[in-house]
Structure formats: structure tokens, C-alpha cells
Amino acid sequence: MLCAIPHFGISQTKKTGIRFFSGGWKEVLIEAKRENKAIFFDAYASWCGPCKAMDSLVYTDPKAAAYFNKRYICFRIDMEKGEGPDLAKKYPSIDGYPSLLFFGSDGHLIKTILGSRTVAVLIAEAKYALLN
């Protein structure tokens, strides 16, 4: 007898990149609380050029991976598919792509950034978010 068990976990952007959680938003919140880690949320769209640049240039960077994988549960979602539209309604600060949101481990929104960032600037923003 086969049993289907849902798999939630971490997916990785290439081998050296930031690990993104592969479950849904509710599971991200549970995991963040369980691990006592903040949440980094990348709200993107499949047609977005700056989003694609972040994916290929920033999220694959070893420095970004080392910083984010240690301190954050990272989550990314296409805001035009699946639970994306509902999350866009829940978080009105998502008003363009990419929108980069930082949450505390308890799920409260700390900060939203609109637009792509370099590795150094994204890490600086992430450090600042952890101070608040």
C-alpha cells in the first residue's frame, strides 16, 4: 500500500545559493517559529526582468547564501499563481516586483523593499531588519 505524504522543505537555487522553502506560506510561518528564524519573502512575477536578475545573480551568490541560510527561512512565490494573489491582498506593501519582505519569526512584517538589490545591499537590508 502506498501512502502519499506531503513534502515540505527547502529547495536550493543552484548548489551554492539561498535555500528557499518549498511549502506554502502557512508552513513557512510554522517553520520560522520552530527554528526561531526571521523570514525573507521574495514576491516575484514570472515576466519580471529584475526578478530574474535577482534569481541568477543574487540568490546564487555564496555570500548571500551563507548569510540568509543561517539566519532566515527564505520563501519566494510567483504572486500571480497559486496562493500569490491572496498573499498580495494580505500584504498591500507588495505593489511591484520584486517586493522583498522581512518578517520576524512570529510572522510580523518588519520591512518591505521594492526593487532588485545587489548582494551587498540585500545583506545590509537583511541585517537591518534583524535589528528591528
What do the predicted segments below correspond to?
Residues 36-39, 43-47, 96:
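Short pre-active-site segment immediately N-terminal to redox-active cysteine/selenocysteine motifs
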Residues 27-29, 33, 60-131:
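Thioredoxin-like thiol-disulfide oxidoreductase module
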Residues 13-19:
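A detector for short, charged/polar N-terminal pre-domain segments
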